[in-house]
């Protein structure tokens, strides 16, 4: 992969952040980030991270950001149309660009769907972390200086009090044995505040935790003003 130019799908979480670090360490030039946000909410889809934090993250990476808005309760048809539009904008900005990376780790069905979608849009998808031992990867992330906080917890898989906790060694010790240490089965999502992929840390302030769809506990965060 050395020497390639690449776009990165950015979720605001640890896997995308670590994929960025891995690619940069491998000699890949990541030229920009692309992120989907839910229209009307101004938050990253799935993670629920505010747009203001997304912008702070992009600034910390010193990479340009392409924002793609999708409707609430988005189906595949609407998602694919919005994503295609975002990739078209990327190619207009970086003519000839044809590779996009995702931070997928384990789920083959999701990876297969994305590979097929990207191929239809004349892009090649790269998953630099796919197949990693997630126990080792989680510890490697923490040892490497990644700082993240759980911003969403699936309460059908984890107790609600895990929402808002730091993604640290203490969290890994407390996770039930059947829970993936990287939350790769949807057990939790994270918001990254610092790491080797950032030029500087971002400071966030924790807000309230709310339950959505009688299942998902979202902890709100805002940029902490100096």
Regions inferred by a protein language model and the residue ranges of each:
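Nucleotide-activated chemistry modules centered on ATP-dependent adenylation/adenylyltransferase
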Residues: 1-226
């Amino acid at each position: 992969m050395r020497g390639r130019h690449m776009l990165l799908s950015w979720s605001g979480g640890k896997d995308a952040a670590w994929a960025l670090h891995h690619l940069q360490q491998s000699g890949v030039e990541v030229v920009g980030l692309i992120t989907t946000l839910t229209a009307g909410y101004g938050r990253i889809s799935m993670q629920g991270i505010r747009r203001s934090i997304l912008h702070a993250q992009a600034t910390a990476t010193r990479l340009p950001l392409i924002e793609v808005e999708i409707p609430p309760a988005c189906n595949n048809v609407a998602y694919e149309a919005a994503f295609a539009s975002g990739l078209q904008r990327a190619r207009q900005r970086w003519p000839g660009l044809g590779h996009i990376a995702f931070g997928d780790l384990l789920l083959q069905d999701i990876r297969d769907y994305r590979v097929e979608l990207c191929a239809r849009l004349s892009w090649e998808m790269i998953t630099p972390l796919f197949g990693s031992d997630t126990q080792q990867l989680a510890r490697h992330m923490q040892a490497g200086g990644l700082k993240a906080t759980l911003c969403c917890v699936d309460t059908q898989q984890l107790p609600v009090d895990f929402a808002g906790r730091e993604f640290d060694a203490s969290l890994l010790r407390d996770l039930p044995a059947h829970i993936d240490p990287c939350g790769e089965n949807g057990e939790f999502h994270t918001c990254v505040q610092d790491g080797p992929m950032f030029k500087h840390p971002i400071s966030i302030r924790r807000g309230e935790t709310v339950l959505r769809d009688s299942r998902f506990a979202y902890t709100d965060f805002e940029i902490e003003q100096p």
